[in-house]
Amino acid sequence: MFLDELISEFDRGLRSMTGVSRMSRPLPVPQESKVTEPAVELSPAERAHAAGLMRVNHVGEVCAQALYQAQKLATKSPSLRAVFDRAAIEEEDHLAWTSKRLEALDSRPSLLNPLWYTGALAIGLAAGRMGDRVSLGFMAETERQVELHLDSHLDELPAADHESRAIVEQMRVDEAEHGKAAMEAGGLELPFPARALMRAVSKVMTRTAYYI
C-alpha cells in the first residue's frame, strides 16, 4: 500500500518537474463581465512581462506539489492525507494551466524547476515532522502568502492579458480555500520569525524564476 502510494507520488513529482501535468478542471477563460479592456494583441514587452509572471506562478505550483506530497507522506492521519491530496490535485490544475499559458505566450517554464521541487520537498518533510498542526499551519501560511502574491500579479499583468488574468483569478480563489481548509483542520498560526523567513525565501524564488 505504502509502496503504491510512493510510486504514485514519484510519478506526480516527475510530471511536476517535466511539465506533463493533468487537468481535472478545464482551463479558466475570461468572463465578459470582467473584461474591461478590448481584445488587442500584446506588445513584445507585455508578452515578456506576462510570461515572466506566469513562469513565477508555474514555479509556485511546482513547489506546491512538492510541499503537499511531502506533507501527505509525513502524516499518519487519513483525514489530513485527504486535505493534502485534494490541495495537490487542485494545484496540479494550476500547474497545467500556467504551463498552457506559457506555451501560448511562446515562453517556457523555469530551468531551475528540479531545484525548486527538491527544496520544497525537503521543506515539506521538515514541516511534516514537526507535527500535524504545525504542518497545517505551514500550509495555511503558504497559501496566505501565495494569495497576496497573486494579488500583486493581477495588478502587474497587462490590462489586455485577459487569459492570464482568468487563470490567476481562479488560482487565487483555490489558494484561499486551501488556506481556510488547513486552519479549519487544526492548523497553528506560525510565529513571526517563521513567516518572515518564508517571505524571504519566496522573494528569492520569485525574482529568480521571473528570468530563469
UniProtKB/Swiss-Prot annotation:
Its main location: membrane. GO terms for biological process: ubiquinone biosynthetic process. GO terms for cellular component: plasma membrane. InterPro entries: COQ7_proteobact, Ferritin-like, Ferritin-like_SF, Ubq_synth_Coq7. Pfam families: COQ7. GO terms for molecular function: 3-demethoxyubiquinol 3-hydroxylase activity; metal ion binding. It is found in: Cell membrane. It catalyses: a 5-methoxy-2-methyl-3-(all-trans-polyprenyl)benzene-1,4-diol + AH2 + O2 = a 3-demethylubiquinol + A + H2O. Binds 2 iron ions per subunit. It is a peripheral membrane protein. Fe cation 2 binds at E91, E143, E175, H178. Pathway: Cofactor biosynthesis; ubiquinone biosynthesis. Its cofactor is Fe cation. NCBIfam families: DMQ_monoox_COQ7. Belongs to the COQ7 family. Catalyzes the hydroxylation of 2-nonaprenyl-3-methyl-6-methoxy-1,4-benzoquinol during ubiquinone biosynthesis. This is 3-demethoxyubiquinol 3-hydroxylase. It comes from Paraburkholderia phytofirmans (strain DSM 17436 / LMG 22146 / PsJN). The gene is coq7.
